[in-house]
Amino acid sequence: KFFGTAQDHKRVKENDLGPNTGGMGAYSPANIVNKLIKKKIISRIVKPTLHALKKKNNPYRGFLYIGLMIKNNNPYLIEFNVRMGDPECQVILPRLKSDIVKIFYNAVNNNLKKTKIEWKKIRV
């Protein structure tokens, strides 16, 4: 399941200046991820990754944080993490309307396909 988007700000100074940090703040949903880019992320990154894991008999259940750079409407993979990103989770979770414990339970029990994940129509 696609679990929402966020965009963080890495630079220490305003206007994207200064050295990189672990994240100076974030907002969600990420404006840059439109329907076309989301489709590209899923088809070019998510599906091939999950297919490769399954092919190696190593199916994955849990968060797969995908750190991206988007340039000219194309997503480029920077990193994977098997946890939510910080500060991204701080702006994604307040938007979650569904019960997160139920989502985790269904993920552990390989039942996410039937799990409906609903979002509040807010920006954080």
Feature locations, PLM:
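Poly-acidic low-complexity segments
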Residues: 8, 91, 99-103, 118
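A glycine-rich beta-turn/hairpin centered on an aromatic-Pro dipeptide
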Residues: 104-124
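Internal nucleotide-binding/catalytic subdomain
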Residues: 1-87
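Short, conserved active-site entrance elements at the starts or edges of catalytic domains
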Residues: 43, 96-108
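ATP-dependent carboxylate-activation loops
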Residues: 83-99
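Functionally constrained cores in energy, signaling, and assembly domains
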Residues: 38, 49, 95, 107, ...
